[in-house]
Amino acid sequence: MRMYDRWILKLLAVFVVAACAVIQGQSAPRQRIDPALATLGGGFVSDSAQVNGTTLHYVRGGTGSAVILVHGFPEDWYEYHRVMPLLAKQFTVVAVDLRGIGGSAETAGGYDAANMAEDVHQLVEHLHLEHVYLVGHDIGGMVAYAFARRYPETSRGVMMLDAPVPGIGPWDAVKSNPFIWHINFQQTPDLPEQLIAGREAIYLRHFLDRDTFSDADVARYARAYAAPEHLRAALEIYRAFPANEKFNAAERDQPVSGAGSRRKLAFRETHAKLRRSVTGSRVCKRQD
């Protein structure tokens, strides 16, 4: 699903304003220093934590109330690199790589949103953070929603960016939308791994707008998914969508903010459903 930097900047600016108002088996990941840290202008560190039977990589900086940033597909934590220095002026910012993606370790299973929300929750506890704000884009929005469902006492609020929620709103329409064909494709057993392997940059470029993402950006994201185990992990997230549908049934009282394009009917209907089913939720719409 396409995402535009200016769109994200504007939405996170809205999020900051809203937050201010409220305030007033696995294998070990490859250890590396991410050169992308240099783009953040200092004050950020890259680290990892053993949580929920896996190892999560994250980038942290700033001080103040905590904002957890959860990326979508086909990105990793770097998706938020432009806004992280801005948020760090007022918040503790933690951008995490989802289980099996980028610098995080892959596992045999556990890729449903509820379990990955537990990953994030244990990371929050590991970092001794309290009452966090969660921002999730795309599949990260599904994790953020599950986090709010499971841990209302830990989350002050959740913001979902262009995130359809399995089982909520017009999910059947989302799955049958030809412009979102990759959902069904990536749920297919085994075949996507064989077709995408070695062609990661070509495949990911399809989802990343050429006016926004340079070839260098695409190459970076391709590296985050290039290892066979990381590609498989990304696909397993999609294969876990049926489990997410079963989880996303009950009404919750945790405030949730949804943001999406006026052009994207499925997202608009999803957010309308969220407004009805989640007490305290609100929806922001951007002008295209």
Task: Name the predicted role of every residue range.
Residues 2-12:
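Bacterial N-terminal signal peptides that target proteins for export
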